[in-house]
A protein has these predicted regions:
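Surface-exposed loop and adjacent secondary-structure segments within mature catalytic domains
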Residues: 1-101, 195-199
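Extracellular structured ligand-interaction cores
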Residues: 10-15, 82-84, 128-130, 203-208, ...
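Generic marker of residues within folded, mature protein domains
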Residues: 12, 77, 121, 199, ...
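Hydrophobic alpha-helical membrane-insertion segments
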Residues: 26, 30, 141-143, 219, ...
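Residues in and immediately flanking transmembrane alpha helices
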Residues: 34, 145-147, 223, 348, ...
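Metallocarboxypeptidase
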Residues: 67-327, 332-333, 337-341, 366-391
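C-terminal beta-sandwich/jelly-roll accessory domains of carbohydrate-active enzymes
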Residues: 333-335, 339-438
Length: 438
């Protein structure tokens, strides 16, 4: 849909499949002032013109398309995009307008896809973790986009690393903090993102997975793999600067494993606006944006396995024991023991606990004739999980049973069983009955 304006603004080349081959490629136009030349090692590739390049054939590169607006044969440029939205800049957390961040939308959650996502998560407070899938780069990204790791509570940072490391191990994707290693400019931050909003607003662990790296698949790993140290990643910088040998390696990969697909040889074409041009170059949508079909299942299987594994870490209430002790004269002492069987605590994250974003456990009792001791409804606290333990028992002070709660009542039995409920927004709901007789 049109954005930021409903009507086209400005003139220039608008992307379009002008030669009818079903692809959006590049057009190269011979021009003595052009910034590009054919690579001497493989003339299919275009490389930047050097200072000393005074003679030879040079080109201008334009996206494949048609001219929009009034055509001037002396001035060529790409037209402003008609669809310039970026939904991952439209979430409410630290949202900034178009004048500060392009693609952000007219106001926070203005776009229906984002708004429905926000409303769904706000109405489903049981969500403990959230993953959004994008393409491309072959990385697992985590908060924050706007602040360094020191801004995260230590326990949450430890859990982000623990969860992310497992995904990184299974997929081969590096685990990155966006602020440290996935910024487009060292002087600016990405804002209005899904994962920052989920973590900050809901206190849920959140991830953005950029599926697929054709560069790594082609064996180009320097600055792009799990062994790369912080500050040395090239996921964004590669498109601004890389040795031509790496592009030749990528081209060889296409020749050897994709039957040449991924790169289209330059073909002469009589353009209706520009006259004679050549159309060809990298097929970005096929090669970079998405895994080619032959690689798709192998790329997605470990990601699916990781997401299922993440869900297994969520808090989960279980009834450990219930005890009915007769006291005589129709009185009973009733005791209920409930555990958190999950790896995460019932509150999920320190962010949620500090922000009071998750209610404590609620316990309800009904069906008795008279309540002698205890409360019909109780608002209790949270239960810890396994993640609160250190990785090694060295210097460990011992394990408290902080994963467990015990509730007791003294009641006079009624005509039927005494029912109990235990409820928690994130850890689930339990129901049962004490077997007592009047």
């Amino acid at each position: 849909r049109p954005y930021p304006f409903a009507d086209p603004v400005g003139s220039g080349i608008e992307p379009q499949d002008v030669d009818g081959n079903g692809k959006l490629l590049w057009m190269r136009v011979s021009d003595p002032r052009g910034a590009w030349k054919a690579c001497s090692e493989d003339p299919r590739l275009m490389v930047r013109r050097e200072v000393e390049d005074r003679e030879g054939t040079f080109y201008r590169l334009l996206p494949e398309g048609r001219w929009r607006g009034d055509y001037d044969p002396h001035v060529h440029q790409s037209a402003p995009s008609l669809q310039a939205l970026d939904l991952n800049r439209n979430f409410p957390h630290r949202w900034r307008g178009e004048h500060q961040q392009s693609g952000a939308g007219p106001y926070p959650a203005s776009e229906p896809e984002v708004r429905h996502c926000v409303e769904f998560l706000m109405n489903h407070r049981n969500v403990c973790q959230a993953v959004t899938f994008h393409t491309f780069s072959g990385v697992i990204l985590r908060p924050y986009s706007t602040e360094p790791d020191e801004a995260l509570p230590k326990g949450d940072l430890d859990n982000f690393k623990y969860f992310g490391d497992r995904g990184s191990h299974w997929t081969g994707y590096p685990l990155l903090c966006v602020y440290h290693d996935f910024r487009y400019s060292p002087k600016d931050n990405i804002t209005g993102t899904f994962d920052d909003w989920v973590y900050e607003t809901l206190g849920a662990y959140s991830w953005t997975v950029e599926i697929w790296s054709v560069l790594r698949k082609a064996g180009i790993t320097s600055g792009l793999d799990r062994q790369t140290r912080r500050g040395e990643h090239r996921f964004i910088g590669w498109f601004e600067e890389h040795p031509v040998e790496e592009e030749m390696q990528l081209l060889q990969f296409c020749d050897d494993h994709l039957e040449g697909k991924g790169f289209v040889n330059w073909e002469t074409f009589q353009h209706p606006d520009l006259g004679p041009v050549e159309i060809g170059g990298w097929d970005m949508f096929y090669l970079f944006r998405n895994p080619p079909i032959k690689f798709l299942e192998a790329e997605l299987e470990p990601l699916t396995r990781w997401v299922v594994w993440l869900a297994q870490a969520n808090p989960r209430l279980v009834m450990a024991e219930q005890i009915e002790t007769p006291l005589g004269d129709g009185l009973y002492r009733l005791e209920l023991v409930v555990d958190n069987a999950g790896w995460l605590p019932t509150y999920g994250s320190q962010k949620a606990l500090e922000g009071k974003l998750v209610r404590g456990i609620r316990v309800e009792l009904s069906g008795f004739s008279q309540l002698i001791e205890g409360k019909r409804e109780q608002q209790l606290g949270q239960l810890e999980g396994i993640c609160s333990r250190p990785v090694s028992p060295l210097w460990h002070k011992g394990d408290a049973s902080d994963y467990r709660l015990k509730v007791s009542w003294v009641v006079r039995a009624g005509q039927g069983p005494v029912s109990w409920k235990v409820l928690h927004d994130r850890a689930g709901r339990l129901e049962g009955q004490f077997l007592v007789q009047k």
